[in-house]
Amino acid sequence: MPAVNQIELHPYFQQKELVALHKEHGITTQAWSPIGGITSYRDSAKRSFDDPVILAIGEKYGTSAAQVMLRWHIQNGVQVIPKSTKAERITENFDVFDFELTAEEIAQIDALDTGVRGGPEPEVITLEAFGRDIPEA
């Protein structure tokens, strides 16, 4: 039984059944692509960064869309590993503990779930497809 399962998880792809299974078995859920940057890769017309619901919540608290999404994860008990190469965004990603989303705001974000993965399907993530040999540690 794993202690942690790292999965694609963001407002547009919430994997609620899997997260519930993790909780049932004491497995920590860790979200990669927690702010939905991956949502722009599948020719989607919608991007979580531009979602009006998320932007409106951010405006209320004076925060970015990314901060709203990170806070949503934290309040749902999910570990997050956001990616950024920009120092100001890395700092911003840590600045999510001075506000709290209401139950209504969490429900609004929960309602954004499309069930559509942004990243590749797990079965296509193979050595042949990605061409990287990862040696034993």
What kind of feature is each model-predicted range?
Residues M1-A137:
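Beta/alpha (TIM)-barrel catalytic core signal, keyed to glycine-rich beta->alpha loops juxtaposed to Asp/Glu
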